[in-house]
Structure formats: structure tokens, C-alpha cells
Design a protein with these regions (language model features):
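Acidic, Gly/Ser/Thr-rich repeat motifs that build Ca2+-stabilized beta-propeller blades
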Residues: 25-216, 272-279
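Short, surface-exposed recognition loops and adjoining beta-strand edges that mediate ligand/DNA contacts
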Residues: 186, 191-193, 241-264
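Repeat-solenoid scaffold signature
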Residues: 250-290
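Hydrophobic helical h-region of N-terminal Sec-dependent signal peptides
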Residues: 14-19
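Bacterial N-terminal signal peptides that target proteins for export
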Residues: 2-13
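Short loop/turn segments immediately following beta-strands, especially the blade-tip
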Residues: 106, 163-173, 230-240, 289-292
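C-terminal motif of bacterial Sec signal peptides marking the signal peptidase cleavage site
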Residues: 21-23
Length: 292
């Protein structure tokens, strides 16, 4: 995402927002991935081509105009907004990719900056990412944030922290008692496909969906948590009954593997987990996640 953008917060919860589809595929990341893919394909692989759609067929498609049953009202603007979490009193926490967390009141229109945000590695698709509230937030005030951080030798990786959102000072919210509970393994070069989406289920298990960082192979590597869907306790410890819990290490975190860039994650009314994954120049996927 380049420059500043405006987030239109609607009075209606759209499915796209619930899936968190507000990520952006950076141009440089797409170019790098295209080059990596060419190198990754061996000369003996056969690629199937499909005929172009006939233009006359396209022109014959029947369309129907539907009455608009909702209204969109812009109530606030943010710089590169990435995620939003709504408190029980209606106030909104909005992450901004460059490293700011805003607390916005849609009634008073007051927007406050939250203090205590960790330093993020801002660039490419990296920065401050997702934010979600603990299911028992009203009692424990735990907020979970994901973000990109710099490592050694120009390597980067995603991190998840847990912190308490201190609202005792009405005009100065802040994060206290921060604890790092998860990180991508390993850190790699490049700043694409962090994904790092967060969601809690009904049992207060934390699900994390990290991307494969445009490196292909880690998505199938059991010694890496890149390109996976992970299931953890609320303190970051791997949850019992995970399919590879007996292997220990990073493998114990894994619920599902072989993912690319999971930018949307949501549970449906049947408590089934769905993940939306961004494809390369098309080919996006909506996947029902089941135990590996």
C-alpha cells in the first residue's frame, strides 16, 4: 500500500470486513514473487494453458441492477489502516501500518493515539498488522497485536504481543504489561506475505495465520511456522489436541499447512474456520480449514 488511504467505517458489518480483506499486495512483492516463481519451476514441468474467453460471450452476459439496501457514511479517516477491533462500548481500535494504534469514538468523533506501541518494521507489506481482543477483554483488558520486526542481516519476521489496554486516563490510552507470545520462524529476507491474521474461537484459543513470506517451501516445512494456520492458547503455548503436538517445537503450533498469504480469517455460525488467501495475479482462494 502506497501513501495514505482513507478507511470508510460503515454502519453495516460487511463480510469483507469480517474476513479482514483490507490487506494490500505491494507491487515490489508481486514482482519479486513472479521472479521467484520462474526460478522455482523446473524445465520439465508442464504448464496447462487455457483459451481466452471469447469477447462475444462476455458481451452476452445478462446483468441485473439491484436496489441498494444500505448507506455508506464516512465517519473518520486513517493513514494506511490495516485492522479494526470494536470494544463493547462501541469505540474502535484501528491499526495503522506505519506503527500507530488509534482509539476512535464514533459518537464523539474523538480519535486518540494509543501509547506504548512497539517499534515496527514499516515497508513493503510490513508494519503494524492485526489486532484482536481477548474474549474476556472486559475483565482482563488483553489486546493482541501482530506486527513486522527487523532481525539481523536484513531479515524480517512477524511477531504477536499481548498487552493490557489501559483506559484509566480518558485522554491517553496506553498499552501496559506487554508480553511477546509468538514469532515467525525463521526470519527471512523481503517484506512480503506476513499475513499474521489473528482470531479467537469460542474456547478462547488464539488462531494465527502467518504467510509463507513469498518463499514457497516453508509452507510445507514442519520446522517453520510460515504458511500455516496455527492454534495456540491465549498465552502463546501450543494448544492441546493440535495434530502435531507430540512433535514439539514449532510443529506443535500447527493446525493446517500449505498456505500462501492468508489475509482473511473468520468463524462462521457453525464455528467452522474460513481463510481467504491472496493468489498471484488472480487465483484468490476461500478455504475451509480442517485439522491436518
Amino acid at each position: 500500500m502506497k501513501g495514505n488511504s482513507t478507511l470508510n467505517i460503515c454502519k453495516m458489518s460487511l463480510l469483507a470486513m469480517s474476513l479482514g480483506l483490507i490487506g494490500c499486495h505491494a507491487n515490489q512483492g508481486a514482482t519479486q514473487e513472479k521472479n521467484d516463481r520462474k526460478e522455482h519451476l523446473s524445465s520439465d514441468q508442464n504448464l496447462t494453458s487455457f483459451p481466452n474467453t471469447d469477447s462475444s460471450a462476455e458481451n452476452s452476459i445478462q446483468t441485473q441492477k439491484l436496489d441498494q439496501s444500505f448507506q455508506v457514511n464516512t465517519v473518520a479517516s486513517f493513514n494506511e489502516p490495516w485492522a479494526m477491533a470494536i470494544l463493547s462500548d462501541g469505540r474502535m481500535l484501528v491499526t495503522e501500518k506505519a506503527g500507530a494504534l488509534k482509539l476512535f469514538d464514533p459518537v464523539s468523533k474523538k480519535k486518540l493515539s494509543v501509547e506504548g506501541i512497539p517499534k515496527v518494521a514499516y515497508g513493503g507489506q510490513g508494519g503494524l498488522g492485526d489486532g484482536t481482543l481477548h474474549p474476556n477483554f472486559n475483565n482482563n483488558a488483553w489486546l493482541y497485536l501482530s506486527y513486522a520486526e527487523a532481525g539481523k542481516s536484513n531479515q524480517f519476521g512477524a511477531v504477536v504481543i499481548r498487552a493490557k489496554l489501559d483506559l484509566t486516563q480518558p485522554n491517553q490510552p496506553k498499552l501496559i504489561e506487554q508480553k511477546r507470545i509468538w514469532e515467525q520462524v525463521p526470519k527471512v529476507e523481503g517484506q512480503g506475505h506476513y499475513a499474521h491474521r489473528l482470531i479467537f474461537d469460542e474456547q478462547a484459543k488464539l488462531w494465527i495465520a502467518p504467510g509463507e513470506r513469498q518463499k514457497f517451501d516453508p509452507a510445507q516445512d514442519m520446522k517453520s511456522n510460515l504458511g500455516k494456520v496455527l492454534r495456540l492458547n491465549d498465552d502463546g503455548i501450543p494448544a492441546q489436541n493440535n495434530p502435531f503436538i507430540q512433535q514439539g517445537g514449532v510443529a506443535a503450533q500447527i493446525w493446517s499447512l500449505g498456505h500462501r498469504n492468508p489475509l482473511g480469517i473468520a468463524f462462521d455460525p457453525k464455528n467452522q474456520l474460513w481463510v481467504a488467501e491472496m493468489g498471484p495475479q488472480g487465483g484468490d482462494e476461500l478455504n475451509l480449514i480442517t485439522k491436518a
